[in-house]
Curated annotation (Swiss-Prot):
Residues engaged in binding thiamine diphosphate: H140, G181, H182, S183, G213, A214, N241, Y362, E444
Gene that this sequence comes from: DXS2
Biological pathway: Metabolic intermediate biosynthesis; 1-deoxy-D-xylulose 5-phosphate biosynthesis; 1-deoxy-D-xylulose 5-phosphate from D-glyceraldehyde 3-phosphate and pyruvate: step 1/1
Feature: transit peptide: 1-36
EC number: 2.2.1.7
Keyword set includes Secreted: no
Family: Belongs to the transketolase family. DXPS subfamily.
Lineage of origin: Eukaryota, Viridiplantae, Streptophyta, Embryophyta, Tracheophyta
Protein name: 1-deoxy-D-xylulose-5-phosphate synthase 2, chloroplastic
Length: 713
């Protein structure tokens, strides 16, 4: 081992500790890893990765694996318990370097993880996980947590098929106390665990870590209100990084959380009164002296009596004891605060407000935390991402371009998103029409009813929300929109399987939960040109609500309409793509492309296939379905959605019309009745049994050709 140009020969006992980390060891031994505050890869000092300069750790990023001698001794949180503050600071530096190196090779969520490195180290140092529970809101920030809880050797598999999940997952590790992926759930879950702990007579701590972006959702306040009423012992860590931890960039840069809370937190951090009182507290406690008073000084420094009323009143009125703001990158301060709060016998609910920087410690992420939020593989030295080139745009961009074209001709069109301007493509719309685009924060319930109010007054709202996120506002869709027949247009992005983000973001259920509503028009495009037509169609529907779903990923290269301006479709009418005789495959949405491929496969088996694009799930094209049923031996419906969706509606019509009373063989191909784990889109399609090969095999099996069918399974 070479450190800062000098060789260190560790004793045998220490060498064995490096190979087989022990739960408890002397922090003095770890100091032998430091020579002139540097960690190097060669004895001449070249290749230095991590160094300490003026009490601050500096990291030199490169494509080489960083030297992390202290992190190498920490497999689980128990290995951190005897570390000094100086050791913890070094551990944080090595952990940050390791996160950047790992994500540069795998892709994933980077900026959020870098922003909580010191917080993660402090939490696992103070609290006795997994007995003590740490609940991470959303979960984008949990890579450091995974590394410190026995999963470092598996980090190269993160978000890959059969690898680690990109979010906390209960069945992955006992250290993942609660699964996540959606926002603003941590306080509710933590409160439930705290109450369960008390009822069961246990004594463990419960910590909920939530970002300021997630605090824009009403659920967080519902939970805090209940926590104050129950007076349960719960620790809430508010990670204030002035960023919504989602791809929320505008074209001018990252977006900050919207609403009054963001302003209140900013005022609190900048409060002159707070700063003066904090300095006064430091002076007084220094005069008293002594270790006990040093601890008291840290807590009193951040106690609620020393903050401005503009920031703390809300939390205190809800019944939470407020501590903060605390520097979220100061490990020593974090440890002191956590230890003091943990030692309190019955503190009730406590909110610790920490201030962090998203992307901290990695320059490319610090200057562009939005662009480095979710990344593909990248060059650690420059931060340049290795994005694959495509001849087509994403479906999201086609949607945005089409909506802009419609809005240029219709000034009643407005757009709404829930803190997802970048993810939904509405950042482009906002650039063009800043007064007609509304970011409501991570508040899908409010987004839907806000859109309903706009529609009630004659505007034409497009509410763009990921399919899985609209689940959070479903009562509003049913009660506030559909029941009143208000013409809100729902653009459901990320419909179907979404690859590496896994089941929390999978848009499996929207066909089912939207098509069961009596007044809703439900559409799905088979390609990017059809998407543009459906944007135009939704614009024209002004007597009832409508929705259209589209997948993650890029278009297939379909010929686009002139000037990217769609044509209004006839409501409830599909189209025939290929004419055949024996078998009919009726696809709904993007899976139509697999249906066409299956027809080509079957043609080689001398099987004549008709392929139809349904376009609409509600209202159904009953004339088309009747024709397909009458003219073919077999009718297969295919969709990338759950049980109860398009296939169920087709089956219901066929049964009521008596078309199932004859010899027709009907099969509905849908997602299996389980959650599909993260992986590549291709792997997920195979796992779900919805590839062109699976469609072909289903046809062959129904035609009494099991041997031929097995060739495609």
């Amino acid at each position: 081992m070479a450190v800062s140009g000098s060789f260190i020969v560790p004793n045998h006992s220490f060498l064995s500790q490096l190979k087989s980390p022990q739960p408890y060891y002397s922090s003095n031994k770890q100091l032998s890893l430091r020579v002139r505050g540097s960690l190097c890869s060669s004895d001449d000092g070249e290749g230095k990765f991590i160094s300490k300069e003026k009490d601050e750790w500096k990291i030199k990023y490169s494509s080489e694996k960083p030297i992390t001698p202290l992190l190498d001794t920490v497999n689980y949180p128990v290995h951190m318990k005897n570390l000094s503050t100086q050791d913890l600071e070094q551990l944080a530096a090595e952990l940050r370097a390791d996160v950047v190196h790992t994500v540069s090779k795998t892709g994933g969520h980077l900026s959020a993880s870098l922003g909580v490195v010191e917080l993660t180290v402090a939490l696992h140092h103070v609290f006795n996980t997994p007995d003590d529970k740490i609940i991470w809101d959303v979960g984008h920030q949990t890579y450091p947590h995974k590394i410190l809880t026995g999963r470092r050797s598996q980090m190269h598999t993160i978000r890959k098929t059969s690898g680690l999940a990109g979010f906390p997952k209960r069945d992955e590790s006992v250290y993942d106390a609660f699964g996540a992926g959606h926002s603003s759930t941590s306080i509710s879950a933590g409160l439930g665990m705290a109450v369960a702990r008390d009822l069961l007579g246990k004594k463990n701590s419960v910590v909920s870590v939530i970002g300021d972006g997630a605090m824009t959702a009403g659920m967080a306040y519902e939970a805090m209100n209940n926590a104050g009423y129950l007076d349960a012992n719960l620790i809430v860590v508010l990670n204030d990084n002035k960023q919504v931890s989602l791809p929320t960039a505008t074209l001018d840069g990252p977006a900050t959380p919207v609403g009054a809370l963001s302003g209140a937190l900013t005022k609190l951090q900048a409060s002159t009164k707070f700063r003066k009182l904090r300095e006064a507290a430091k002076t007084i406690t220094k005069q008293i002296g002594g270790p006990a008073h040093e601890v008291a000084a840290k807590v009193d420094e951040y106690a609620r009596g020393m903050i401005s009323a503009s920031g703390s009143t809300l939390f205190e009125e809800l019944g939470l004891y407020y501590i903060g703001p605390v520097d979220g990158h100061n490990v020593g301060d974090l440890v002191t605060i956590f230890e003091k709060v943990k030692s309190m016998p019955a503190p009730g609910p406590v909110l610790i407000h920490i201030v962090t920087e998203k992307g901290k410690g990695y320059p490319p992420a610090e200057v562009a935390p939005d662009k480095m939020h979710g990344v593909v593989k990248f060059d650690p030295t420059t931060g340049k991402q290795f994005k694959s080139k495509s001849s087509t745009l994403s479906y999201t961009q086609y949607f945005a371009e089409s909506l802009i074209k419609e809005a240029e001709e219709d000034d009643k069109i407005v757009a709404i998103h829930a803190a997802m301007g970048g993810g939904t493509g509405l950042n482009y719309f906002q650039k063009k029409f800043p007064d007609r685009c509304f970011d409501v924060g991570i508040a899908e319930q409010h987004a839907v009813t806000f859109a309903a109010g706009l529609a009630a007054e004659g505007l034409k709202p497009f509410c763009a929300i990921y399919s899985s996120f609209l689940q959070r506002g479903y009562d509003q869709v049913a009660h506030d929109v559909d029941l009143q027949k208000l013409p809100v247009r729902f653009a459901l992005d990320r419909a179907g399987m979404v690859g590496a983000d896994g089941p929390t973001h999978c848009g499996a259920f929207d066909i089912t939960y939207m098509a069961c509503l009596p007044n809703m028009v439900v559409m799905a495009p088979s390609d990017e040109a059809e998407l543009m037509h459906m944007v135009a169609t939704a614009t024209a529907i002004d007597d009832r609500p409508s929705c259209f779903r589209f997948p993650r990923g890029n278009g297939i290269g379909a010929k686009l309409p002139a000037n990217n301006k769609g044509t209004i479709l006839e409501i409830g009418k599909g189209r025939i793509l290929m004419e055949g005789s024996r078998v009919a495959i009726l696809g709904y949405g993007s899976i139509v492309q697999q249906c066409v491929e299956a027809a080509s496969i079957l043609k080689k088996q001398d099987i004549s296939v008709t392929v139809a694009d349904a376009r609409f799930c509600k209202p159904l094209d009953t004339d088309l379905i009747r024709r397909l049923a009458n003219e073919h031996e077999i009718l297969i419906t295919a969709e990338e959605g759950s049980i109860g969706g398009f296939g169920s509606h087709v089956s219901h019509f066929l049964s009521l019309s008596g078309l199932l009373d004859g010899s027709l063989k009907l099969r509905a191909m849908v997602l299996p009745d389980r959650y599909i784990d993260h992986g590549s889109p291709q792997d997920q399609t195979e796992t779900a049994g919805l590839s062109s090969r699976h469609i072909s095999a289903t046809v062959l099996s129904l035609l009494g050709k099991p041997k031929e069918a097995l060739q495609f399974m």
